[in-house]
Curated annotation (Swiss-Prot):
<dbReference type="Pfam" id="PF04738">
    <property type="entry name" value="Lant_dehydr_N"/>
</dbReference>
<protein>
    <recommendedName>
        <fullName>Nisin biosynthesis protein NisB</fullName>
    </recommendedName>
</protein>
<comment type="similarity">
    <text>To B.subtilis SpaB and S.epidermidis EpiB.</text>
</comment>
<comment type="function">
    <text>Involved in the post-translational modification of the lantibiotic nisin.</text>
</comment>
<keyword id="KW-1003">Cell membrane</keyword>
<keyword id="KW-0813">Transport</keyword>
<dbReference type="GO" id="GO:0005886">
    <property type="term" value="C:plasma membrane"/>
</dbReference>
<keyword id="KW-1133">Transmembrane helix</keyword>
<keyword id="KW-0472">Membrane</keyword>
<dbReference type="InterPro" id="IPR023809">
    <property type="entry name" value="Thiopep_bacteriocin_synth_dom"/>
</dbReference>
<dbReference type="InterPro" id="IPR006827">
    <property type="entry name" value="Lant_deHydtase_N"/>
</dbReference>
<dbReference type="Pfam" id="PF14028">
    <property type="entry name" value="Lant_dehydr_C"/>
</dbReference>
<feature type="transmembrane region" description="Helical">
    <location>
        <begin position="838"/>
        <end position="851"/>
    </location>
</feature>
<keyword id="KW-0812">Transmembrane</keyword>
Amino acid sequence: MIKSSFKAQPFLVRNTILCPNDKRSFTEYTQVIETVSKNKVFLEQLLLANPKLYDVMQKYNAGLLKKKRVKKLFESIYKYYKRSYLRSTPFGLFSETSIGVFSKSSQYKLMGKTTKGIRLDTQWLIRLVHKMEVDFSKKLSFTRNNANYKFGDRVFQVYTINSSELEEVNIKYTNVYQIISEFCENDYQKYEDICETVTLCYGDEYRELSEQYLGSLIVNHYLISNLQKDLLSDFSWNTFLTKVEAIDEDKKYIIPLKKVQKFIQEYSEIEIGEGIEKLKEIYQEMSQILENDNYIQIDLISDSEINFDVKQKQQLEHLAEFLGNTTKSVRRTYLDDYKDKFIEKYGVDQEVQITELFDSTFGIGAPYNYNHPRNDFYESEPSTLYYSEEEREKYLSMYVEAVKNHNVINLDDLESHYQKMDLEKKSELQGLELFLNLAKEYEKDIFILGDIVGNNNLGGASGRFSALSPELTSYHRTIVDSVERENENKEITSCEIVFLPENIRHANVMHTSIMRRKVLPFFTSTSHNEVLLTNIYIGIDEKEKFYARDISTQEVLKFYITSMYNKTLFSNELRFLYEISLDDKFGNLPWELIYRDFDYIPRLVFDEIVISPAKWKIWGRDVNSKMTIRELIQSKEIPKEFYIVNGDNKVYLSQKNPLDMEILESAIKKSSKRKDFIELQEYFEDENIINKGEKGRVADVVVPFIRTRALGNEGRAFIREKRVSVERREKLPFNEWLYLKLYISINRQNEFLLSYLPDIQKIVANLGGNLFFLRYTDPKPHIRLRIKCSDLFLAYGSILEILKRSRKNRIMSTFDISIYDQEVERYGGFDTLELSEAIFCADSKIIPNLLTLIKDTNNDWKVDDVSILVNYLYLKCFFQNDNKKILNFLNLVSTKKVKENVNEKIEHYLKLLKVNNLGDQIFYDKNFKELKHAIKNLFLKMIAQDFELQKVYSIIDSIIHVHNNRLIGIERDKEKLIYYTLQRLFVSEEYMK
């Protein structure tokens, strides 16, 4: 067995509190209602989980429910009944959580005590706080919501919690807002002091208007009060009540709140099944304060401890290693496409404020699959590469064999494939958390990988429970500390994101304990050191990966979220910060992607662990009048017992049970209306693995794995330029520059550069000016032409005639006049940018000559030859023929490996250089002399300004990159090959003379 680089840690155990063997079987829904109405434990579970459904059932029992609502009631109650016995995922009073450990021998008995961890329902609490912020605003202190940011003359919030219909809100950035915002930026300020600050500027006669404006900021959460401090993390009943008591002179809230606290304490000591009346009492008291769908949240905590043995630990670590290695096959994701857009717009030498970056107009918007909010422009789906063609063939071959032989798909044979894959490609995973169900097959205990598999966000599963007991606090801290230590070694500051979701109904899953150095809060605040949203800048590091920096402290940050909220529901900015911090390639499992379109997938196993149970898709179109549901599932050879699955939600069904078949039929009908499918999954015996009081329980575990092999000390003490303001960097049309986007298909761009660009260059030269161009795609291919001369309007009139001719000849389809956003940071500042632009202009004069040379049938020059040798000449000019300096540069920027064998090409290029044929045709061209002069001017300027060597290299790299863009187009892989070949070429020239 290959040694794992992941070490399994103590794990979370989640199990049902009811024994599945005690579950009754029913043939009619009336039997269900009759039974559950006598089951005090289930009734209390239901009253907590869904108070409205509990009330509807009471109406039915009293004969007061309308007939059309009865069927829905029956089905809902039946599903909850099944859940109470058969699902172990944490939810209310249905299941409990404990900590398990690895030891010499396994032990599956739960012998500890179960306690209730009770919190106020977060939606109820937040709504109450918002109400009190209005009622007691004059007695409270306020701070600025960190979700606010200024953009132009408006103040936006990254999302809103006031309306599920809106993705963002904004108000005008006024002098009054500026005064209040700056006053409340770093701490809580009393209401009276805020008003006083405004009236000091405008006079007492504006007091009433100031209070009205301040009230609107509070209602719309531009300001948040001290009541919100630590609501989502480290919440304390006593601290909260002390704050309320200080402002509630009429005792409107404090008396009932203290009564609620007392009732909750009493309820926490009552056995489950005996607490219905006390629970109703709590609901009654809380509803009089504020009505809501739910009132309290409960997680059951057990001090039991089960054990897995050494062999099981090794088996799980083996699985973690295999799953971790699958990330090596991921070559391109949506974030890689986003990175390319970032580099094209900003280069790699500047940091961009995250709020500007995500703006669809002034930035580049959000990555393709981000939806909160959606980009307000259309874009086609970017290409991705999650696995190789070789992998695809392996998986398909295994699938065919398994289906043909009615066998499982065994992934053991792929282990060596992933182990060998790109040995120099290091995985960036700091660790994993895997979700596993416990089951039994052929009298043997087995693990089944959960439907949501897991994640690489260590602490994500334990954060919600971390404040419920000292043991769980310590457990969570141990997991988080492993990440903290690694980040500290890399000089990275960790930051926990704490936020209210857009829909505060989901806020119950947002609880966590803060165990990191800093916090990024949205729509809430904490007692910890906080990072301001507006101080977060995004850049590209030396490995071409995204990073985030706090511009006020220069710290490189990584962001984590250890609540259980679905990341696809995060606002775009938060999701991005979270995903780039995790380098989130884990979870793109090749078998899921390759098999996802199949209607049947056999069981997948690895080292006797079930990676994925057998699955069947049932489409609505599969059902017809000639075949019953039972006949349909029999025709697909679906077993007698199975699950109907939706994400991590699954319901056990049996073909023998008529009520189960009704649930299945109802689900198929619903999917038919959506023109969708339902997924069925094979059933495993899971009822008697873990025992409590001599009775079995359904259970699952969450096992964290911490990487044991250090990823190395990769400190990030690099410096990037802060992006210059829009006002200084952007040139409006006909203001110094004229910027044209000429939309031309890729296959006709060279024709335009050969036949039309020289004429445009003559027009500009006659007006004492110059121009340069770039090739681009966003998303349509075009040539970007930037022109500078004494009379841009006159030049435009003449250029327009040439463009008309190119359009008449069907070369150019259309063109735009745009704003020139100068890449000031990329080229070291305004002075060196101007000198770089001179290089671009000289280079743009050479390109038509190079294309002519390539096109000329009288020689055998190929585009690869010309691109290599002109790059060679560029390097010779920049480094004044010093090969050692050239090699130092190439060692930094060149890739370490390419697929092509370049040995023969090196010999070919060396011969070409000796013949010097290329030099005769290009090197002595007057335009090349102009280019050499421009390069020399830039080089001397960089020396005069004492640029760091890293900065010099970066500017040279950028200049060569845009030259290659002009000559060969957007070919990043080819550019890597060019650099690699040049490195080999200069090594040969220097050391093999």
